[in-house]
Amino acid sequence: MKLISPPVRRTATAPATAPGARLGWLDALRGIAALIVALHHFDVLRMLPFGGAVWRNFDMGLFGVMLFFIVSGYIIPASLERRGDVRAFWIGRIFRIYPALIAAFVLSILMLPAGDGSVALLRTGDDLASLVANGLMLQDLLGVINGMNVTWTLCYEMVFYFLVTALFTRGLHRHSAPIAAALAGLALAVGTAVGTQLISAELGSTRQLLLIVTPLVLAGLAGVLSGRPVLTGTGALLLGGVGLFLITLNSRAPAFETWMIFATMFAGTVVYRAQHGQLARLPALLSCGFVVVAGVLVGWLYNHGEALDRTWSSGWKAWSVGYLAAWALFGVGFLLRGRRFPRVLTWLGAISFSVYLLHIPLLRTIEPLVGVPPQPSSVLGRIAWTALFLGVVLAVSHLMYRLVEMPMQRLGRRVQKAADRRWPSAAHPAPAASTAPAETVPTEAAPAEAVRVLSGPPRTGG
C-alpha cells in the first residue's frame, strides 16, 4: 500500500558527505552497543577491580538497550516513509528478523550443552503457547517466557512497528514530538502505580489471552500485507490497538520503563525529523530534552524495591546514569555524523543483530570447554578468555550475517517485487509528503538489540 510518493531527489544541493560517512555513524553506534551487550553478559565487570563500583552506578544493560532503541526510533519510521509502501516495509522487516532469529534458535539448540537453559522455547510447560507467542514476537507482553534469553526487547520493537504503521496510515506520523513527550510524561505520572502483567497472571489466563491476540495480530498483518488501502489502514489500526492494549495492561516491565522505552524510540524519530527539516528545532529540542530528563527522573523516583526485580538493575543511579549515557553517546555520534568511522565499527554494526542473538549461546557453549567458571584469576588469563570469547562471537556472527541475513534480505526484496507484480498496490493519496531528500534517508536496521535476561523468573544482581 503506497501512501506517499517517493521523495524527489535533490540535485542542486547534493550533500558533500559520502554515503558511507552519512550512515557510518549509525552503524558505529550499533556496533558499540553490540559490543557492550556481549561484554555485559560476559560479566566483564566481575573481572575488573573497579567493576563493583561501576555496576552500582552504571547499568551496562540499560545503556545498550536504550542506545539501540534510540537508533531504531531514528531509522524505522524513515524506512517506512521512504517509499510510503506499508507492504514493502513489513516484508522487509519479516525477512530481516525472522530468518536470523530462526537460525539462531536452531544453532543454539544444536550446540548448547545438555541442561543449559539459555533457550527455553520448548521448555515452558506449554510448547504450543511458547511457539505462538515467540513466533508473534510478543511473548514478553503475553506472559510467556522468552524463547531465547535476550529476545524480550524484540517484543517492544514489534509494538513500535505496530504503532508507527498505524500512525502512518492515519497521516499522524509527523507528530513524533508531542507523542514522545506525552509518553515520557505518562512514564513520570504512572511510575509503578499500574501493575505488571495484569491479564496473564497464570497459565490459564495466558492461554486465553493468546487465543484472543493471535487471530487479531494475524488479521492485522494480513491487512498491512494486502496492498489494499482500506485493508491496510484497518490492519494497521488493529495492530496498533493490540500493541497499545498489551503494553498498557500486560507488560512484564514496570510501567515507567515500558513507557520510557516508547518515549525513547519516538524521541529518536524526533531527531531524524529535525535533522531533515520536517520539524522545527525548538519543539524538537524541547521534546527530546523532556524525554531525557524524564528518563533520568523515573529512575530516581521509581527504580527501587520490587521494581529492581523487573528492571534487573542495582538501583536508581545505575538506571538513570545508564539512560543518560545512551543519549550522550548517541549525541556524540550525531555530531560526528559527517565523518568517516573506522571500518571495524561499521562492520560490527552490520553484524550486530547476529552478535545479539548468538553471544549468550556461544558463551554457554565455550565455557565448559575451557573450564569456566570459575573466572581466570590472572590478568593474562582474563585477557585471553575475553579475547577468545569475542573472537568466537564475532567470527560466528559474521558467518551468520553473510550466510543467513544477507541472502534472506535479498530474498525479501525479490518477494516484495513479486508481490507488487502479482498484487499491485492501489494508489492512495498521501497523508503528508516527505521533505527529506531521498539520498539522506537511512536504510533499515536490524531490530533494537538488547541485553536483558529472562522474561520469566527475574534475574537478581549484576
Where are the predicted features?
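C-terminal "closing" transmembrane helix and its immediate cytosolic amphipathic cap
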Residues: 1-17, 333-349, 360-462
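Transmembrane alpha-helical segments and their boundary/interface "anchor" motifs
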Residues: 62-66, 79-118, 125, 130-133, ...
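Interfacial loop-to-helix transition and helix-capping segments at the boundaries
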Residues: 23-24, 53-65, 144-156, 195-216, ...
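Alpha-helical transmembrane segments of multi-pass integral membrane proteins
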Residues: 62, 257-273, 285-406
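Membrane-interface helix-loop-helix regions
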Residues: 97, 101-162, 185-200, 319-330
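Functionally critical transmembrane alpha-helices in membrane proteins and complexes, commonly lining
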Residues: 21-80, 95-101, 105, 325-329, ...
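Structural signal for the C-terminal ends of transmembrane alpha-helices
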Residues: 77-83, 112-113, 166-175, 219-229, ...
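Aromatic-anchored segments of alpha-helical transmembrane domains
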Residues: 35-42, 183-197, 238-251, 289-304
